[in-house]
């Protein structure tokens, strides 16, 4: 069930008894938001109580004066712009002359101090003046005005709320999920959400709506205490304009943008109840992953978006976590339920699949279009029947599952695009594919007695393919140590708690047609006519060097490894360190420099540089917006490299595994992948430098 579904719709009762209860609760003091919510129940607030309620909702009631320690000097480089914007705002308010000067100073001080304390450069496009408008009408003292403004900026204005910003790519995915036809139309006209909704989000509608309407919207929004709810309010406003937009196809791009941008201005007080009710409905029909996977858009900058987070502008559709897929279909009654479509090749599906998944071989789309069309027809019929019968496999929401490997999932992406082109609503993709599902089941110890997921995996036999212990040992035996693996021809090895057992898994897996490395779309499509390479333990050509620890080896990459560990073993300070690329390349201790692309587990790539010194290897990731500069993305000691591997199909894709060794075996601590031109020369040079380090340690 999507988060926020429990919040009741706006009631229609107009009795004033609740207003008296509210006033008494506020007068008594110590009132929290939950208490207020129970009294107000979403109704528009009385004007004389609004300030107190908002301060409690924003958690600033009783907070001290943040500006007390400030010298009050208005001396920012952009101060003239701030003053001009504030003056223009005061003129619009029709404030008595004797109060205008004081209010002007308050507003200018709030903006100036916020810029100074947060180290932000002010510009008119930021919508801050509009954001202050509803607060100014509350006639708050300067300290409260600042505290409320700060709280709204921190909790309700998303990070990167700018042209081409991440919040707007996310909004497009939400539009596509619920209104694919409208999304397709806007895409065709190259109208992106930031072109019309920048100030919707940046001012929480205050830029376009009257003060009265804005305050009514904020009354409900602040009581929800859910920053993501603004997305659903925006969606309803957009959906409300859908019919007009689609019937005026002759309008130019600029005309459509102007029309959309001003749509909120037509809202009146009577519309607010329906606006919230409809937004709540769409919210309840949205997967929880929409919020959970993007929670870092809001809140403290300490939880900011990492550079390696998925680029939402490149996302084909909304991604759903495998944990949500499993949990959703165990729910009873209303809520988001998924009809899972497994798009892997037949041999992989037969080896093991989610027991409730419908199989749709994505290869058929190119190899046998007529059979593919029939399969799609069967899929939709099966979905309909499963919903009608109340089956656990039933769900309105189509979720496509691939292998989790970008090279193979390209074909699934074509299938996804097919459904999106048909304007099919509620289309999503399982994040990480079947590989992520297996990993999740291993992580939660799927055979444990206290969970209900044990029946989720099926195989060709039709019976449950349990996650059995390796080497045929009893699940309860002492040698098992709780480490499980799918061994009935499963296509990837699961993460285990012991390297020794992990090594055993390798020799048990015969079919390795589900490699784990997910590549970006820039790489050439795999040749589907070629025979898949089967891997056995004999393929492990790398051997320890003279027993030196840690063990280091070079060889072809095992295409079933799933013990992925994020390579970010650095501190936050390291991650933020910015350096000049050329200065570092020219350092006397840098022995080798290799331009490359860092490849994250998600498949996304970042232009980078590998620098090798006598003892360390550094990865400098280029900062796109600051030419010539880079982040120190990784700093690894050469003696911690335990394995370097490459792919048969993509020899330029090099994987470095870092760790240490003990009597029980090798412990992998970090994994990094790079796409390196002339990879052979690079790995040779790095290997030679590693050998020098190991020789020095040995001697």
UniProtKB/Swiss-Prot annotation:
It is found in: Golgi apparatus, trans-Golgi network; Cytoplasmic vesicle. Residues 514-573 are annotated as: May mediate the interaction with C17orf75, FAM91A1 and WDR11. Residues 459-483 are annotated as: Disordered. The modification Phosphoserine is found at residues 300, 469, 474, 507, 520, 571. CDD domains: TBC1D23_C-like. SUPFAM superfamilies: Rhodanese/Cell cycle control phosphatase (SSF52821), Ypt/Rab-GAP domain of gyp1p (SSF47923). Isoform 1: Widely expressed, including in fetal adult brain (corpus callosum, pons, cerebellum), spinal cord, heart, skeletal muscle, thymus and bone marrow, and at lower levels in spleen. Hardly detected in liver, kidney, colon and testis. Isoform 2: Expressed at high levels in liver, kidney, colon and testis. Hardly detected in tissues expressing high levels of isoform 1. Expressed at low levels in spleen. GO terms for cellular component: cytoplasmic vesicle; cytosol; Golgi apparatus; trans-Golgi network. Residues 459-479 have a biased composition (Polar residues). Residues 574-699 are annotated as: May mediate the interaction with FKBP15 and WASHC2. The modification Phosphothreonine is found at residue 514. Residues 334-446 form the Rhodanese domain. GO terms for biological process: brain development; embryonic brain development; neuron projection development; retrograde transport, endosome to Golgi; vesicle tethering to Golgi; vesicle-mediated transport. Keywords: Cytoplasmic vesicle, Developmental protein, Disease variant, Golgi apparatus, Phosphoprotein. It holds the Pfam family RabGAP-TBC. Residues 514-699 are annotated as: May mediate the interaction with WASHC1. It is linked to Pontocerebellar hypoplasia 11: A non-degenerative form of pontocerebellar hypoplasia, a disorder characterized by structural defects of the pons and cerebellum, evident upon brain imaging. PCH11 features include severely delayed psychomotor development with intellectual disability and poor speech, microcephaly, dysmorphic features, and pontocerebellar hypoplasia. PCH11 inheritance is autosomal recessive. Directly interacts with GOLGA1 and GOLGA4. Interacts with FAM91A1, C17ORF75 and WDR11; the interaction recruits TBC1D23 to AP-1-derived vesicles. Directly interacts with WASHC1 and WASHC2A/FAM21A. Interacts with FKBP15. Putative Rab GTPase-activating protein which plays a role in vesicular trafficking. Involved in endosome-to-Golgi trafficking. Acts as a bridging protein by binding simultaneously to golgins, including GOLGA1 and GOLGA4, located at the trans-Golgi, and to the WASH complex, located on endosome-derived vesicles. Together with WDR11 complex facilitates the golgin-mediated capture of vesicles generated using AP-1. Plays a role in brain development, including in cortical neuron positioning. This is TBC1 domain family member 23.
